Amino acid sequence: MMDKIDKEIWINEDKTALDPTMGAGNIIIAILYRRIVENNQNPIKAISNTYGIELDQKTHEYAKERIKKFMAHFTNEDLTKIIDHNFVCSDVFEWNITDWCPKNDKVELEGFFENA
């Protein structure tokens, strides 16, 4: 499926990628591989622009460990802060993807009844 994406997307280091149901991180690792190995992106830039959401806590922790191990092949830097920020345990429908934070029901409903 990733082969259907225009090569220009993979080359552009400023493009972000999101796996909204990342499971064990297979797609995340494939994205990072494509960015770093196949397109020579800076590893820190590549991981900084890659995001994932997983609902199950154990699977989420497992995915983060796999991502850390994969990234250790390309950098010695401690990526804990980036990985903890970019790969979250949440319900995708309760996550504000634009602001990368949990949705706040109060904010979501503000102004809803004003025009009623």
Question: Can you annotate each of these PLM segments?
Answer:
Residues 2-116:
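SAM-dependent methyltransferase catalytic region
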